[in-house]
Structure formats: C-alpha cells, structure tokens
Design a protein with these regions (language model features):
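Boundary at the C-terminal end of the N-terminal hydrophobic targeting segment
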Residues: 54-59
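Extracellular hydrolytic enzyme modules, especially secreted metalloproteases
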Residues: 177, 182-331
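Bacterial N-terminal signal peptides
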Residues: 40-52
C-alpha cells in the first residue's frame, strides 16, 4: 500500500514569497542580481514542495496488538506455544463417543453429515480463508463407550476436560493422534467445548503433549466452526464470567459471538489468521481519507480499515471499519452495510474483546449511504457517502 505526505502548501509558499520579495522591496533596482538569485531559489523550493507531495511512501502495516500481559485467547497475535499456523491443509480426525446414561443410537455417518453440514463446514473455512486453508476430515465411525456415566465427566475445568480427552484417546489405541492438527469428538451431554493449553497443562499422550482438541454435542456446522476456531486461537465474543458492561456486544456479526446467525468471521479474524492479504487492508492513524471499501468476499480492493486508539506503533486497541457479511436466516434483509467495531487485545475470551458500535441496535448495526458515525470512544468519525453498484461503499474517515 502506498501513502503520501500531506504538506501545508499554501503556508510554505507564502513564507517563501515573504522571505524573498518583502526584504527586496526597497532596493530592488540596485540589487537586481540578488533579487534574481532569490527568485530562482524560491522557484526551486516550490518545485521541491510539489515533488514531495507526489512522492509516495510505504504505508504502515497493521502492527500486532499489545496485550499488556499474558492474556488467554486474545485478539492479539496467537500464542505459538499453543496454536499452529492457520495456513495450508489441516488434517482433522472425527471420533464418536457416548455413555451408559446417554446412549447414541443414530448412525455415525448420519451424525457426520449433520455436524459437517454435508461439506458446509469445510466450504466455510475454504471460502473465508480465500483458499488459504483447507480441512480434511477423517472419520472413525461407530460409537465407543466411555467407562463412566456422562454425569461423572465435565469440560468445565481444564483438569476435568484434560482427563476426559485422556480417556477418549485410550479408546483408540491404534490411532496416532499426534498425526492430526485438530481432534474432534462427537458426544452427548458434555456440550460444545474447545481445549487449548500450553504444554504444562496440555493433554499427555505417548510421552508428548496435545495442545488442542474439541468435543461437540450440537449437530451444526457453524457450532463446529466456532469450536474449531478456538483451536486456531480465537476467543469467545459472547459474554460470560460476571463481566460488567454490555452482554454479547459483538452481536450476530461473527461466528465467535453467534453461531446461530453469523455467516462467517469478521475482517479482524481473517487478518489474525493471515488470510486477508496486505493489499486488502489499510492502517491509518491520522488525517482525512476518502476511501472505497469492498466486501470481504471480494477478490480485490481494500476491505478492512484499522485505526489505533492508543499508540499507533504498538496499539493495544483498534477500531475496524468493514462491510458486514449478510446474516443468515430471517435477519439477512438489509444486514449489509458499513460495520464499525473495536478490538481490544487486553481483554480475554468472554470479556468483550470485540464491541460492535451499531447504527440502531446490534441486529441493525450497519451504516448506509448518508449515515454518519461518531462516538466518544472512537478516534475517528465516518461519513458513508454512497453505495456503489459493485456492493462497495465510498466513505470518508477523519482520524482525530
């Protein structure tokens, strides 16, 4: 991306004129050589001004957000001690386990088609990543019985969740789970939960450690996508744990806040996963900008604008502008527009790290042509000038 220096041309020009001509006004006739030399100097300086104006400089890339500490499942850079790259082909293994007090009678092939949405799950990650990530899911069909009733297991604590996976792995002695990127276990009663820990808390397996795995009870490709994204480092965007302030402030605009309504991941998450190319995003920290912003699913154009709230070189919080993705179901009508939200890397999963700033309410959050956005929390103001035929929007952003 290219940027240009902004120079106060008029002020600089007037200073040059004043320094050249006013001192000469009384002695112009008898000091013509000196006058001539100053005139030439002035013209040279003016030309340098215009050369400087047109000289492009490399625009600043979006820096990693500063978490200001050790934050669990942050919107900042992924913890490399837990999470692997989110680029390339990923091998997944899907298992099926039940309990004596929760016996599963549905055929596991039918269950697989339901939870994967007949391929919708894999398609979602392929399309959202612009083809940069593919998921191959291998199945071990047939329900295998755990040794105790479901009531004796839990995924509510790290310890109980780890013990559950240790026993599940013991049910499959011939499988090398270290050969897989993501382990997915279908089971009733235990809920939908992702495990992700550093080695000291990870799942012990054959003298090594497995850092990520998930269990799923729901039959939904979007719920599975939500839990899989946890294995990739994303936090929950819905609120829990006694957090003060708004509940679920990200609304239905990302799978991590609403697997029931969202159709994909916010632009920030595509950026975090390194799916969104550098020329598709813009980082601005000052000035007035008139920009055309394209949908995230477009093949070109700037689709995400990021503005720092604090230190522009090492921010901990930013605001993001993008075009919203259409919601699923009955709420899809008029759900596409300019979406504004903040991302705070200091806040852990479930503690509102992403907040959408809606035009009306969270279901009607996007802004449309003629709308203005200003908020006391935001470092910028936005005018939505028009919507183009190609679904892009022309906006004006003024960064304070």
């Amino acid at each position: 991306m290219q940027g240009v220096y902004t120079i106060h041309i008029f002020d600089r020009f007037m200073i040059l004129i004043k320094n050249t001509f006013i001192p000469l006004s009384e002695k112009t006739l008898n000091q013509f050589p000196r006058f001539y030399s100053r005139l030439v100097f002035t013209l040279v300086m003016i030309s340098q001004v215009f050369i400087t104006i047109s000289c492009p400089v490399e625009a600043m890339q979006i820096p990693d957000l500063d978490t200001k500490g050790d934050v669990y499942k942050t919107e900042g850079a992924n913890d490399s001690l837990i999470y692997d790259s989110t680029i390339g082909n990923k091998k997944c293994i899907m298992l099926y386990a039940d309990f004596s007090d929760a016996v599963m009678k549905v055929d596991t092939k039918e269950r697989a088609n339901g939870v994967l949405g007949n391929g919708l799950f894999q398609k979602l990650f392929y399309e959202q990543s612009y083809g940069k990530m593919t998921l191959d899911v291998e199945h071990v069909h047939g329900w295998r019985r755990l040794s105790k009733p479901a009531s004796k297991y839990s995924s509510r604590t790290t310890e109980s969740h780890r013990e559950l996976f240790v026993e599940i792995f013991d049910l499959y002695p011939k499988i090398d789970f270290l050969a897989y990127d993501y382990i997915m276990v279908n089971m009733p009663r235990i809920g939908n939960t992702a495990f992700g820990e550093r080695d000291e808390l990870a799942i012990p397996y054959k003298g090594k450690k497995i850092n990520v795995a998930l269990n799923i009870s729901s039959v939904s490709p979007y719920v599975l996508a939500h839990e899989t994204a946890h294995l990739m480092g994303l936090p929950d965007l819905y609120t829990y744990g006694g957090v003060e302030g708004p509940k679920n402030p990200a609304g239905p605009w990302d799978i991590m806040s609403s697997a029931g309504k969202a159709s994909g991941f916010l632009g920030w998450h595509r950026h975090k996963f390194e799916w969104l190319d550098a020329n598709r995003k813009k980082y601005i920290s000052s000035g007035m900008h008139r920009l055309e912003i394209t949908p995230l699913n477009a093949s070109s154009g700037v689709s995400m604008i990021v503005i720092p709230v604090d230190d522009p070189v090492k921010p901990s919080k930013v605001f993001v502008i993008e075009i919203s993705q259409p919601l699923r179901g009955k709420d899809s009508q008029n759900s596409v527009g300019v979406l504004v939200y903040s991302v705070d890397a200091k806040l852990a999963t479930g503690r509102n790290p992403v907040v959408v700033y809606p035009k009306l309410d969270l279901l009607k959050a996007p802004f449309h042509a003629g709308d203005h956005f200003n908020h006391i929390d935001a470092p910028m103001g936005i005018k939505v000038l028009k919507k183009n035929k190609d679904e892009s929007f022309l906006i004006e952003v003024k960064v304070d």
